[in-house]
Amino acid sequence: MKVAIFGGTFNPIHIGHLIMAQYVKNFSEVDRVIFVPNGVPPHKNVDIALPEDRFEMVKLSIEDNPDFEISDFEIKNKEPSWTINTLNYFATSYEKVYFILGSDNLFEIIKWYRAEEILKKFPIIVLPRERNTTLIRRQIEELGIQFSAKMVLIDMPIIDISSTEIRRLIRENKSIRYMVHPKVEEYIIRKGLYKE
């Protein structure tokens, strides 16, 4: 089975994440998209909900889609969530492992822990975060030349929703309806998440 690993803080998961994952399933050769919420994100120290809450929100968002699944690999691991460790873990169980990367991280990936190994070993599905893809395509080409990286850019609409904006709306007691799965909205309200 060919799988695409969709890692992230998912703080909280929103419809943009779900649409991106569905585009990956629709327009690549992967059989399944595996959501992997970060346990201890190495590069972020913002207002992050408990790993268990973020895991539950992802689970609620994807439970009715047979093409999606969730893994607690990073959440169970108490070490920082390094991408290479996660990809290597899944590579032991699946025929082919792809890595989903937002184009905003395309220019940062070479600074990541064991970046060269990621780029040489795993094919990468790039999702655009901006309308003009000229620089993105150029960077994909350069990484291909420098590291023999296998990358493909999925042509899809820009989904301009962010978890940061959702958390701000919650703090201001504004509605997040249509921005997250209804079950996630219900969960956030019930648990009182992101109020402070």
Swiss-Prot record:
Its EC number is 2.7.7.18. It comes from the Bacteria. Belongs to the NadD family. GO terms for molecular function: ATP binding; nicotinate-nucleotide adenylyltransferase activity. CDD domains: NMNAT. It holds the Pfam family CTP_transf_like. It is an enzyme of class 2 (transferase). Keywords: ATP-binding, NAD, Nucleotide-binding, Nucleotidyltransferase, Pyridine nucleotide biosynthesis, Transferase. The keyword Protein biosynthesis does not apply. SUPFAM superfamilies: Nucleotidylyl transferase. Catalyzes the reversible adenylation of nicotinate mononucleotide (NaMN) to nicotinic acid adenine dinucleotide (NaAD). The keyword Kinase does not apply. This is Probable nicotinate-nucleotide adenylyltransferase. It catalyses: nicotinate beta-D-ribonucleotide + ATP + H(+) = deamido-NAD(+) + diphosphate. InterPro entries: Cyt_trans-like (IPR004821), NadD/NMNAT (IPR005248), Rossmann-like_a/b/a_fold (IPR014729).
